Amino acid sequence: MSVAADFSDTEQILASDLLITYTCDVRPTPEQQATLKAFLEQGGRWFALHGTNSLLDFDTTNGPIDAFGVTIPGVPYAPDLAPDYMAMLGTRFVTHPPIQEFEVTVTQPDHPLMAGIEDFTTEDEPYCCDVLGDINILLESRYSSENMSELPDGWDNPNRVHPQMYLKKVGGGEILYLMLGHSCGQFDMQPIMEQCDVVKCSWGLPVYYELLERGLSWGIAAQVPGS
């Protein structure tokens, strides 16, 4: 097993059977993207969590802004910085309104990964993502909140389906993506701010740990409980 902060150890990735990512704004170079694709095509499995599909930048047009008492360079946004990487993942993060409560619906109760899982309510970042290519949705949500009205380009449509967990085949391999899972520890925002509020979101739910365990079983043994 190897732990890394980015995708730079391409030899280790290619030598692995399972890749797990829990990242935000970690940008693979073109060479690293080619390695990730080769890893999947040779049969690798990738369990991607939360912000893996989130690459961020700041719109500095109007200069620095104050965000919750902290000065940041500008308005954060998610430009399409790595289209091939996002196409490989199957989704690209675009935006999210504030953390809020929403329902998560099981779309395929007979799928081995979903066996015995019931619809549930969570409080998390309601991710709004472009869907790129063919994905097999296992969990989905529809957001209905006044906060959504602030979002552009039709994201405020209460009937719009937002994938929360899905599978995507790439060559001989496969990606399992779980959107839920924002968290923030007391010191996670350093050096931007000294301390911040602890936020656990879906990590506080037993069903979330069940989904994680099933994802690990899927990745390690190419099977899940009950399959």
Give the role of each language-model region.
Residues 91-179:
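Catalytic beta-strand/loop cores that center a nucleophilic Ser/Cys/Thr
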Residues 6-8, 24-28, 46, 52-56, ...:
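Solvent-exposed loop/turn segments at secondary-structure junctions
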Residues 2-3, 18-22, 45-49, 137-139, ...:
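Structural recognition of the beta-strand scaffold that forms the well-ordered cores
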Residues 1-17, 216, 220-224:
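Aromatic-Pro/Gly-enriched surface loop or interdomain linker
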Residues 3-8, 34, 160-165:
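Alpha-helical scaffolding within the catalytic cores
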Residues 26-116:
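A glycine-rich, often tryptophan-bearing local segment used as a flexible ligand/cofactor-contacting loop or short
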Residues 151-165, 169-227:
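Extracellular ligand-binding/catalytic regions of CAZymes and related secreted enzymes
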Residues 18-27, 201-204:
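The substrate-binding groove and active-site-proximal loops of carbohydrate-active enzymes
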